[in-house]
Amino acid sequence: MYLYNTLTGRKEEFTPVEPGRVRMYVCGPTTYNYIHLGNARPMVVFDTLRRYLEYRNYDVLYVQNFTDIDDKVINRAREEHQAPLVIAERYIEEFFKDADALNVKRATLYPRVSQHIDAIIAAIATLVERGFAYVADGDVYFEVEKFPAYGRLSKRTPGEMRAGARVEVNTSKRNPLDFALWKAACPGEPSWESPWGPGRPGWHIECSTMALKYLGPGFDIHGGGADLIFPHHENEIAQAEAQTGCTFARFWLHNGFITVNQEKMSKSKGNFFLVRDILKRFRPLAVRLYLLATHYRSPIDFDDAGLLAAERGLERLENTRRLLGEARCQLTGTGAETTVPARTSALAGRAEELRQEFISAMDDDFNTARALAALYDLAREINSYLNGTTTIDPAALRTAAITFEQLGGEVLGLFGQARQQVDDELLSGLMDLILQVRQEARQRRDWATADTIRDRLKELGIVLEDTPRGPRWKRS
């Protein structure tokens, strides 16, 4: 497996430090608002990477934080006349609603800044003690010039970094690039006691502290959006490596922006679309497919056409699942699995070929666009097989069905959650029973009953089709 490492600027073969186990950290949201589609992209991208690693038999320790102490959270709390942590808790709950809708699996751990203040203070104290940080008027700053490797991740010159950093006029700083590790308390803001006086953590020290606490130095993958490369991830590296003297993270993966008219989608620009609003118009799994249909490092320029195409693509995959479900029900219901003679079939072999194409795509810097193409090809092969034969080879069908479910559901997460699967299985079982009753009526030449069943099903949105292999059904 090869992944593009932002740190080195090239694809590198990925092997975890600990055989069979991957340690992975992804920057989570600042919890002051509902998430927009740009926030959702790293959620889906790194969830799918985690799923794929698990499919390849890795045990993944996946940590994603919540930034529940931040200027934005405090400002929203002032606007709504509530405590900052109350605001944060509300939007954490909303985050999980959107994540569940998009079929994002729960991370192993969701550490919150507010629960790690002691660890953050200890990390800052170490940096001060080692000479990488200084105290000024109750604030504590990281001294960038003391860390010679600063700029290694973003490949920026000092001048470019000054232009790109969130630099405020501050005469307490020795260098405009120096960044806050600890902010002295201000009236009306949450604060904690520290060796430097009451205050709260800076943004960057929060992530590096939690990552080191749960994953240790030299962990395997650190992920996030490309907008975090500088200054956030650059600063994380400086803080962590200045503390430990060890590599912070080995592979740095960054997803591309979602743009609107070629401009980055962001709350600050007001050109964002909330996930909760998009889900009122498009199905959640179609939105997930939309985010996976482009290579994760490439930008996506948002428009309805792409989401409509994703809806159609999802319908193609769901149609194949329906055909597979019908075929399995017919085999199970008729005992055909033991009575139908096996016939030479290329389906099983073709399913394995396409599985290897899928793996090859995912192993090449996690290319979900190519992997989806292999999945669509497999759907086409299954459809052709089921629509073109009156005698099913159960073993071939089972192989193709398992492969299809693993790649589309287990890895890409496009086939819904357990509740929907149970509902689909229940519907398939009920339809199998109804079709059996109708078939018995036809055998008795009770055409009125058979026609009534067909007509009532049509009223309920289910269309029957009589084929040489027996009746089939589909949602209208």
UniProtKB/Swiss-Prot annotation:
- Which cellular compartments is it found in? Cytoplasm
Give the classification, highest ranks: Bacteria, Bacillati, Bacillota, Clostridia, Moorellales
From what organism does this protein derive?
Moorella thermoacetica (strain ATCC 39073 / JCM 9320)
Motif 'KMSKS' region, chain ranges: 264-268
User: Reaction catalysed?
Assistant: tRNA(Cys) + L-cysteine + ATP = L-cysteinyl-tRNA(Cys) + AMP + diphosphate
Query: Would you tell me the Gene Ontology cellular component terms?
Result: cytosol
Q: How does it assemble?
A: Monomer.
Note on how the cofactor is bound: Binds 1 zinc ion per subunit.
Q: What is its main location?
A: cytoplasm
Q: Which domain of life is it from?
A: Bacteria
Name it: Cysteine--tRNA ligase
Name the positions where ATP binds: 267
Coiled-coil features, chain-numbered ranges = none
